[in-house]
Each structure stands twice: as C-alpha cells, then as structure tokens.
C-alpha cells in the first residue's frame, strides 16, 4: 500500500514486480551516468578548459556512435528478459476469470463448480474505521500465496484494465477478447489496485482487492463460499 508523500515504489509482492523495480533502478543509473557525462563536458566547455577549432573529428563521431549503442544494449537486454518473463505462464495452481463492468468487477474461480461473485466498491458511508476510502470492496479476491495464479481478463461493456501495482500486474479488459496474465504472491497480505483504463463517469470507483493467504486458509474460505 502506498503511503503519503512516498517517493519510491510500493513494496514488491511478486517476483515480476521485484524484477521491474530492479530494472527501474538500473535504467535510472544509466540515465544518471549519461547526465553526469554531459554536465561534465558542458562544464569543461564553459570554463574553456576544453575547446577546439577542429571541424572534422572522426574519432569523436566514432565515440558518439558506439557509446549510444552500448547504452541501448544495457537497457534492451534486461528489458527483453522481463518482457519474456511477463509473457511466460507457468502451470497454474489456480485460474481466475475477471470481468469488467461499468462500474464493478465480477470474478469466477474456474477450478470450482459454483464459486463466483461480484465485487463492488464499499461506499464511504459504510466504510469501517481504519479502512481505505475508494479502495475497499465488499468481496475480495482470495488466493493462496506462493502458488502460480493465472487470471483471464475480459470486459462486458467498454474497455477496462485490471491492475495491481504491488504485484506488477496490469492487463487490459477488452469486450469480446480474453487476455491472460499470471503472478505469484511471495507473502501474505492485502494488495490494492484499481481499473486503469478510463471507462466512464465512475471509472475511479472500480477498486481491486487481492488477499493472499496460506493454502489452508484459502481452502477454508473457498469451501465456505462455494457451499
């Protein structure tokens, strides 16, 4: 959960998000090195410690061709690795289906016979003390932690987007199309997200709440809900 005046990312709760945070730091260091080099050269030029009347320097042209190529390789390799990791779906222990509506989500646990529900935002007037405004729902998604989860995402009316930042998940929900993604939660907890595609007047009132629990707790919850 993000805190007031927080400058960094939320704590990663999935391997993919951990990789994304590391890649962000890596890219930031590369950008910092480039800025430092440019500022250093500008300082030398402005203090006249580095000046030249040379109008042709093939060595310089070679340097400003090779250095950007090296920078692009340093950014492209980890980026491609993460892209492949995000597209790779392991054999899931559990499959969910999320359907976006104006303006709520409905969920189906396809591995269970009768386990489905709608998830609406909890109105501020009904919000228990200590809960988060505009982020709480009447029915949370409950999943077992440290288990590969596949989620199939679609929409019933207009474009939506199912996103939970701390899990590193953001997938568009498109009417007539099934998109899928996967994730693994690395710790127990409650993770919040929202619809991330403008979908109408109440777009801001489509929160997503994922509760990661030990397997025994999930089995108890699923048996109670499906009975």
From Swiss-Prot:
GO biological process: ATP synthesis coupled electron transport
MF terms in GO: copper ion binding; cytochrome-c oxidase activity
Transmembrane segments: 15-45, 59-86
Membrane topology: Multi-pass membrane protein
Keyword Nucleotidyltransferase: no
Name of the top EC class for this enzyme: translocase
Tagged with keyword Transmembrane: yes
Binding site for Cu cation A1: 160, 195, 199, 206
Matches recorded under Pfam families: COX2 (PF00116), COX2_TM (PF02790)
Cofactors required: Cu cation
Residue intervals annotated with topology Mitochondrial intermembrane: 1-14, 87-227
Record topology, Mitochondrial matrix segments: 46-58
Main location: mitochondrion
Purpose: Component of the cytochrome c oxidase, the last enzyme in the mitochondrial electron transport chain which drives oxidative phosphorylation. The respiratory chain contains 3 multisubunit complexes succinate dehydrogenase (complex II, CII), ubiquinol-cytochrome c oxidoreductase (cytochrome b-c1 complex, complex III, CIII) and cytochrome c oxidase (complex IV, CIV), that cooperate to transfer electrons derived from NADH and succinate to molecular oxygen, creating an electrochemical gradient over the inner membrane that drives transmembrane transport and the ATP synthase.
Family per record: Belongs to the cytochrome c oxidase subunit 2 family.
Quaternary organization: Component of the cytochrome c oxidase (complex IV, CIV), a multisubunit enzyme composed of 14 subunits. The complex is composed of a catalytic core of 3 subunits MT-CO1, MT-CO2 and MT-CO3, encoded in the mitochondrial DNA, and 11 supernumerary subunits COX4I, COX5A, COX5B, COX6A, COX6B, COX6C, COX7A, COX7B, COX7C, COX8 and NDUFA4, which are encoded in the nuclear genome.
Name of the protein described by the UniProt record: Cytochrome c oxidase subunit 2
Species of the source: Coturnix japonica
Underlying gene: MT-CO2
